[in-house]
């Protein structure tokens, strides 16, 4: 999916922080990620950004779909195993086209992506381990409450930001759980 940032808030933020106005931002995904889209659309609408979907159905479409992006646009990648499996190619293309990407997991940023915000995977595994422990101690699995992730992490790659010609705001860096330099 791709979202176009033409709203006043995007322009005002850019002016106040000495950045060029965002032209668009958005998401690419292999499927609609039904649970993910309403949140993205609501947040975009509140900032005056319109959202359009770009579906990537196979590896051949990756370059075809991403090559249409321009600098000052952006892409958000929702959780998706297809995107994760092809992350090296996606990161390479976005870097070549100078388009920032926001990803769902830290490993994208470790591999050269710009920013990730997502579930803290080790914490999620610990949470699962606690469930296994309770089951092994005799708790009926049907008696265990459903749980959602409780810990999320923000990771920023400053080397990638520099390669893209972006200045990451100090407020974002201060909130980051990890900054890769």
Show which residues each predicted segment covers.
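Short hydrophobic alpha-helices and adjacent helix-cap/hinge residues
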Residues: 1-181
């Amino acid at each position: 999916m791709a979202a176009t940032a033409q709203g006043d808030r995007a322009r005002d933020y850019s002016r106040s922080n000495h950045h060029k106005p965002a032209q668009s931002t958005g998401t690419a995904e292999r499927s609609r990620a039904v649970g993910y889209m309403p949140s993205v659309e609501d947040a975009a609408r509140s900032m005056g950004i319109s959202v359009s979907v770009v579906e990537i159905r196979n590896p051949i479409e990756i370059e075809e779909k991403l090559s249409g992006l321009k600098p000052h646009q952006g892409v958000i990648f929702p959780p998706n195993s297809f995107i994760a499996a092809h992350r090296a190619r996606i990161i390479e293309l976005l870097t070549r086209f100078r388009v920032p990407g926001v990803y769902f997991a830290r490993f994208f940023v470790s591999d050269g992506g710009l920013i990730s915000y997502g579930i803290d995977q080790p914490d999620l595994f610990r949470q699962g381990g606690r469930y296994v422990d309770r089951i092994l101690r005799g708790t009926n699995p049907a008696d265990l409450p459903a749980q959602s992730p409780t810990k999320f992490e923000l990771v920023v790659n400053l080397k990638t930001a520099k390669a893209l010609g972006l200045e990451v705001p100090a407020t974002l860096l201060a909130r980051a759980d990890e900054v890769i330099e």
